[in-house]
């Protein structure tokens, strides 16, 4: 049996369900960033984590190998959906200002080599897709158009995998560029072919979906009382079978996660960041 190691972020006191054949081991590590951490983003090689405040003000990074924390920007919205370049040496992100009551975003680029940043796009009221500025292959939910923009090697198409009139979020392409996972606001988490065909329902609650390889997706499964989130735990889904494995329990409220290859990092409502290693058998 081939054993594949996946590194996941998790909170202390959590446990994995060993009844699922794919999970064989787990341990937990807390990452001390010296402040509250929310909305994590991982570099392509999994060495650096971007994080921000609960309301996305400011953008910081931590190198998981050296534990060095760096302040990238302190302006509003800087932590909303930042994107690494392919080699991980730079990050592209937005900041926000208000002019005459209208929010306007600009785009900035930060270098981890020079530790400097520069504005690469002036403030505009238009919607900015940072993914398109760092990659030619990506997927992006166009909420206003009720579609998903899929770009493969720079060729862009708009698709509606489960039909028109839906609000698509958190679209992500599998590492082998064959599958697409996405969330629909009211319908849940789905997987489809890259052209949107053969869409398959995975679960009714699946926020922040991330591919850990070509076969497994992790996501946040939440519950609410109609007003606020009351519980949130990380689940792993085998996309071929739809089998769901709970990786954490309800003891800690998770508010964000990110995954790259063998690593997942997530944060809690208290602003804590954790790393958890598990083994998944294929």
Question: What would you call each of these model-derived segments?
Answer:
Residues 5-14:
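Sec-dependent N-terminal signal peptides
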Residues 20-282:
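Sequence signature of WD/YWTD-type beta-propeller architectures
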């Amino acid at each position: 049996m081939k054993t594949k190691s996946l590194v996941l972020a998790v909170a202390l006191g959590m446990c994995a369900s060993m009844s699922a054949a794919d999970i064989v081991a787990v341990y937990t590590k807390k990452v001390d960033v010296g402040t509250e951490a929310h909305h994590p983003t991982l570099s392509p090689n999994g060495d650096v984590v971007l994080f921000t405040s609960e309301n996305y003000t400011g953008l910081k990074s931590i190198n998981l190998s050296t534990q060095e924390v760096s302040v990238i920007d302190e302006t509003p919205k800087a932590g909303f959906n930042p994107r690494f370049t392919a080699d991980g040496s730079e990050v592209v992100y937005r900041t926000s200002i208000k002019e005459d009551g209208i929010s306007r975003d600009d785009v900035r680029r930060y270098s981890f080599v020079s530790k400097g940043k520069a504005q690469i796009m002036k403030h505009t009221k238009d919607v900015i897709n940072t993914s398109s500025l760092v990659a030619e292959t990506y997927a992006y939910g166009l909420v206003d158009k009720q579609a998903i923009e899929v770009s493969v090697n720079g060729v862009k198409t708009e698709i509606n995998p489960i039909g028109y009139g839906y609000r698509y979020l958190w679209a992500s392409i599998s590492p082998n560029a064959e599958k697409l996972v996405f969330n629909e606001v009211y319908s849940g988490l789905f997987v489809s072919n890259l052209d949107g065909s053969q869409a398959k329902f995975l679960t009714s609650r699946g926020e922040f979906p991330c591919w850990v390889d070509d076969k497994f997706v992790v996501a946040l499964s939440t519950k609410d009382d109609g007003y606020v989130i009351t519980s949130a735990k990380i689940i792993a889904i085998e996309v071929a079978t739809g089998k769901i494995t709970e990786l954490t329990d309800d003891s800690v409220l998770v508010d964000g996660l990110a995954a790259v290859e063998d690593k997942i990092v997530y944060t809690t409502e208290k602003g804590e960041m954790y790393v958890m290693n598990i083994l998944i058998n294929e």
